[in-house]
């Protein structure tokens, strides 16, 4: 796992098209903004896990 330190307002790049910006920090919560192309899905982990659990085997991924 790559570990990075960023301050509020600073951005990191994932590939050429995805940016993640630290918007704010309050207590133990960090607000981030993700800018990605429409074809790139962005989910919180708990939502992603629910989506994966609900997939029907053999169903195409769109």
UniProtKB/Swiss-Prot annotation:
Compartments in which it is found: Cytoplasm
UniProt KW keywords: Activator, Cytoplasm, Repressor, RNA-binding, Translation regulation
GO cellular component annotations of the record: cytosol
Gene Ontology biological process terms from the UniProt entry: mRNA catabolic process; negative regulation of translational initiation; positive regulation of translational initiation; regulation of carbohydrate metabolic process
Primary localization class, coarse: cytoplasm
Family, per entry: Belongs to the CsrA/RsmA family.
PANTHER family per the UniProt record, alphabetical: CARBON STORAGE REGULATOR
NCBIfam families, per the entry: csrA, PRK01712.1
Name of the protein in question: Translational regulator CsrA
Organism: Aeromonas salmonicida (strain A449)
